[in-house]
Amino acid sequence: MLCMFDLPVETGEEQRAYRQFRKNIMKEGFIMMQYSVYVRTCPRRVICASIEKRIKRIVPAKGNVRLISITEKQYQDMKILVGSRSLQEECLGTERMIVI
């Protein structure tokens, strides 16, 4: 699942809302793929649906937040035209789960 967002940060209140949203999606297991684009694996559609419900409860009042669910195969087929995979992506690799 990909979470992409563009949130205003002009006022102190908007900055707090941005930081809180970012912190909350990271608590949901999302890792930063690139600036304002976060990714997380979902082994089943029912899990994606429950994550979507939780994300809907924490979105700030202003801005733009989008979610999209894609398969692992589609994610693996993503082409990187410039740059490289993030450190978090390298650590995760193609594994669905990280055992700590």
Which ranges hold each PLM region?
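Basic nucleic-acid-binding interfaces
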Residues: 1-2, 8-100
